[in-house]
Amino acid sequence: MAKGKDVRVTVILECTDCVRNSVNKVSTGISRYITQKNRHNTPNRLELKKFCPYCYKHTVHGEIKK
């Protein structure tokens, strides 16, 4: 049986390069991925290297609030 709250929670990962660059110029978009993380194993913010189709390279995608 499960104890307490759900251990797995859905999180959104957003490209950090697109967010920084969109302030200075008009960007075509911001890359976002939806994934799940285990709250017990990773209590802090999740950061993964993923491919950004707007930057055309692999960049760090950080967890954002919903």
UniProtKB/Swiss-Prot annotation:
GO terms for molecular function: structural constituent of ribosome. Pfam families: Ribosomal_L33. InterPro entries: Ribosomal_bL33, Ribosomal_bL33_CS, Ribosomal_bL33_sf, Ribosomal_zn-bd. One of its GO terms (biological process) is translation. It is found in: Plastid, Chloroplast. The keyword Hydrolase does not apply. GO terms for cellular component: chloroplast; ribonucleoprotein complex; ribosome. Keywords: Chloroplast, Plastid, Ribonucleoprotein, Ribosomal protein. Belongs to the bacterial ribosomal protein bL33 family. This is Large ribosomal subunit protein bL33c. The lineage of its organism: Eukaryota, Viridiplantae, Streptophyta, Embryophyta, Tracheophyta.
